[in-house]
């Protein structure tokens, strides 16, 4: 009798323990906020890949998944459509969506870099050699506006450029076929183009960095942020920790990015070394002037016909200020 009672007690205790574990897991799951982050399929979003893979987002209460797009602004369109919670793009595509009525906010700048490069035939030795040449880039992307600024900086009239709209994944192929003389994009397409062209192409110097520096803005739906203010702060805390991880664990970061992008780990490590990405999370009011310049260019080129979006309303510094006021400059 005693033996049977003990068995029953053991089984009951085991069952109770199992239920307790399930309840604990359920409680954890219920406290997590689902966040679908988007990223351009390139090495520049490595901090997000780290947050997903190393459990940093989950640590801060975020049930995160990073969705890859060919280019960052497609992620912004997904946010506008309610198919994602975050995106990261530069000024031009963001301004275009704002002008069309997208109600987006920017809690932080999350990537700063000199990552855009001009891959050109070796016969193009200096900026002015681009006049009359066929140059590929993604219309409406960061490369579009950055290359325009580059031409302006180096005295090349825009109507002298034969612009060709080519998706990132096809740029190397169209150059190899001889359909274009140069293209403007970032890694890993820069190195891939150099490898395929086998000495017939180079990275043009001076480069885009003489005219434009990439700032990638964390973009979110205003409605979502206002309904999930604690989660917004938690997401920013997680991104700050992602930056710290990248700085402390460069090799592990390369391995994670390589797996996400389906490239060799050594290639990812090399790209991270050669491209000066800064994943520090901050918000600088200087960005408002950049947006103002973009708006002028858009209007002059027929890309902005209505009222200029109110950029002051777009920036929401209060969430980052809760974490670290020193990261918020000029607001």
Q: Predicted segments — roles?
A:
Residues 1-17:
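N-terminal secretory signal peptides and thylakoid transit peptides that target proteins
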Residues 92-93, 164, 169-260:
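Pocket-lining segment of extracytoplasmic ligand-binding domains
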Residues 298-331:
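Conserved C-terminal helix/tail region of periplasmic/extracytoplasmic solute-binding proteins
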Residues 29-167, 172-174, 181-187, 202-206, ...:
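Short, glycine-/small- and polar/acidic-enriched structural segments
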Residues 65, 73, 271-276, 285, ...:
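Short linear loop/turn motifs
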Residues 226-305:
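Secondary-structure end/capping motifs
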Residues 84-88, 176-181, 274-290, 321-328:
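Short amphipathic alpha-helical segments at helix boundaries and their inter-helical linkers
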């Amino acid at each position: 009798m005693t033996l049977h009672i003990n068995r029953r007690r053991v089984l009951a205790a085991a069952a109770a323990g199992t239920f307790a574990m399930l309840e604990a897991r359920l409680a954890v799951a219920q406290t997590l906020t689902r966040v679908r982050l988007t990223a351009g399929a390139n090495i520049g979003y490595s901090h997000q890949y780290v947050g997903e893979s190393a459990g940093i987002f989950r640590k801060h209460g975020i049930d995160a998944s990073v969705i890859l797009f060919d280019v960052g602004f497609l992620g912004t369109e997904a946010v506008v459509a309610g198919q994602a919670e975050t995106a990261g793009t530069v000024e031009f595509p963001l301004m275009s969506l704002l002008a069309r009525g997208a109600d987006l906010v920017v809690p932080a700048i999350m990537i700063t870099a000199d990552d855009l490069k001009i891959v050109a035939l070796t016969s193009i030795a200096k900026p002015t050699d681009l006049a009359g040449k066929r140059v590929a880039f993604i219309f409406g992307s960061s490369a579009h506006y950055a290359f325009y600024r580059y031409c302006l900086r180096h005295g090349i009239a825009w109507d002298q450029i034969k612009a060709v709209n080519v998706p990132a994944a096809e740029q190397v192929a169209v150059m190899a076929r001889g359909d274009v003389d140069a293209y403007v994009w970032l890694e890993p397409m820069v190195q891939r183009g150099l490898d395929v062209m086998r000495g017939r192409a180079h990275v043009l110097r001076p480069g885009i960095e003489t005219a434009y520096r990439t700032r990638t803005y964390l973009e979110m739906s205003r409605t979502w942020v206002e309904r999930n203010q604690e989660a917004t702060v938690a997401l920013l805390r997680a991104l700050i920790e992602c930056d710290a991880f990248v700085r402390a664990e460069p090799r592990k970061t390369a391995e994670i990015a390589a797996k996400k992008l389906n490239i060799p780990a050594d290639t990812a490590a090399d790209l991270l070394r050669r491209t000066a990405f800064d994943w520090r999370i901050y918000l600088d009011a200087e960005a408002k002037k950049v947006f103002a310049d973009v708006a002028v260019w858009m209007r002059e080129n027929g890309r902005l016909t209505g009222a200029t979006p109110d950029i002051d309303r777009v920036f929401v510094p209060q969430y980052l200020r809760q974490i670290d006021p020193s990261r918020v400059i000029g607001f």
